[in-house]
Amino acid sequence: MPIQNFAISLDLVNRHYQEPNRNRYESRYFWEQLYPLIATSGFSAIEIPYEPVWQFGGRSGVPFNRYCVNTKYGDAAGYRAALAERGIARVTGITFDPNLFMRNANIDFFFGASGHFAGEALAHAADMGADYFAISPSPYYGRALHYHPDLEAQREAFTARTVSLLSGLAAKAQDLGVALVLRNEYWGLFRGEAILPLLAALPETVKLDVDTASLQIAGVAPADFIAANITRIGCVHLTDTAFVDNDETWKTANPEFPERRATQVFRDPGTGTVDLPGIAAQLASVGYAGPVTLSARQTRDPFRALLRTRALLNQLQN
């Protein structure tokens, strides 16, 4: 696949558990020094997580929401110009995770806050000229279960409210010219193939965001899943892992960091057991022309991860 088909996600900088320390990554200079390194690694396109939390912390250096972008650059156009000056030609996608709002027993709060900020993030995606807006359709299963012990009994009602929220976003996305795609994560209520009934209940404009590592951890072969659902795929995240979830880590409150093992879930692309070259070849063979994003999520060293991802990119182009 040609290099211009690939983007890299800024989730390679872990804002919660590791270096760079908070004083660095909450500063504008850190990101403006990072963009040329991304471009030098061969990427002219990026994906940006949308994280409302940064507008509540007193600083605005993390460019992961509308408030921070407007504070530092005036507006989205100003930020896009700053990216272009540093070798980043476009933002292919914005991602949104509602976990921040699963924080109490009030389910109305969760859906209300998630809907409000997802709508804000979707509008920001349009302002950034993004191709897609990738939303996690549920919070962590274990986090939701902690605040809602009757979650399984309420699954049908939870799903119905999720369909309502996503249907509203789908209509807005269509008006804005942005594709709404559902993230497929191993820790959610709609993990693995459980996302397919949810997708079937939504408008045809809503597509799948295939996360290769999450599928493998959930016990689903990524290649088989892609082959069976190619017509509904709107984005592919090439993520890597060597993690085997043999003790139901997906049901814990923080499934990205297993509480019963000293390990991590994700690996830098090309260092795990997911057949990423095979999946890239499969996508090319079926004529897939949609967004493909490489993610070094949870990496211990973002700068080393850039080099490792570039090494994988060299394989994917051969």
Locations of regions flagged by a protein language model:
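Acidic/histidine-rich catalytic cores of soluble enzymes
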Residues: I3-N5, N14-N21, A45-I46, S164-P269, ...
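Short acidic/polar active-site loop segments enriched in Thr and Asp
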Residues: S44, A89, D131, G234, ...
